């Protein structure tokens, strides 16, 4: 992507639990191509995605991460946490286990980002609000996925997902 903010966000993932995601975005993934990241009206893909913050998408052998344009002015640290989540999705299959893992990764990365870049905690940003909610769930569960998992399983957007998916083995 040529959006400067995504380059900044990727740099912020260095040395965090999201480094795997950073490498996946740079091309170390199932497709062997870099992931294309862009802001996009998600309702153009599917009306059901209109309110989503972001989606990971695979199309014609390439991976994409589309981020809701409402986050265009989010701090790069919050975008970094979001990217660490979306880069987990590398195939056409999704599951509750994969989402639980991705949301937990996002919460852990956000916690790490705040330690390194406290200025990321800009409370004006809707994305920062999301990240802080995830961080609270992580802390409430004593740094396990206990409460994040409950939140994922209760999410309307995931109600038709299977428990597991072929490309994802839950640790």
What are these regions (language model features)?
Residues 1-64, 122:
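Auxiliary, metal-adjacent structural segments of Zn-dependent hydrolase domains
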Residues 10, 14, 131, 135-138, ...:
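Residue-level detector of alpha-helical secondary structure
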Residues 44, 91-92, 101-106, 118, ...:
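Charge-dense, intrinsically disordered terminal/linker segments
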Residues 73-78, 82, 96-97:
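Soluble non-cytosolic domains of exported or imported proteins
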Residues 81-93:
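Active-site recognition of the HExxH zinc-binding catalytic motif
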Residues 94-133:
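Post-HExxH zinc-binding segment in Zn-dependent metallohydrolases
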Residues 139-171:
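Pan-zinc metallopeptidase signature
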């Amino acid at each position: 992507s040529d959006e400067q903010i995504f380059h900044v966000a990727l740099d912020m993932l260095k040395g965090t639990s999201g480094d795997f995601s950073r490498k996946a975005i740079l091309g170390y993934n199932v497709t062997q191509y870099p992931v294309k990241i862009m802001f996009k009206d998600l309702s153009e893909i599917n009306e059901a995605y209109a309110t989503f913050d972001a989606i990971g998408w695979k199309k014609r052998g390439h991976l994409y991460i589309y981020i809701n344009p409402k986050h265009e002015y989010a701090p790069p640290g919050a975008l970094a946490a979001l990217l660490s989540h979306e880069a987990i999705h590398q195939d056409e299959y999704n599951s509750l286990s994969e989402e639980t893992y991705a949301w937990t990764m996002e919460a852990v990365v956000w916690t790490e980002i705040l330690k390194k870049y406290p200025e990321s905690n800009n409370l004006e940003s809707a994305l920062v609000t999301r990240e802080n909610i995830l961080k609270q769930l992580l802390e409430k569960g004593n740094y396990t996925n206990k409460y994040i998992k409950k939140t994922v399983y209760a999410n309307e957007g995931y109600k038709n997902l299977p428990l597991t998916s072929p490309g994802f083995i839950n640790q």
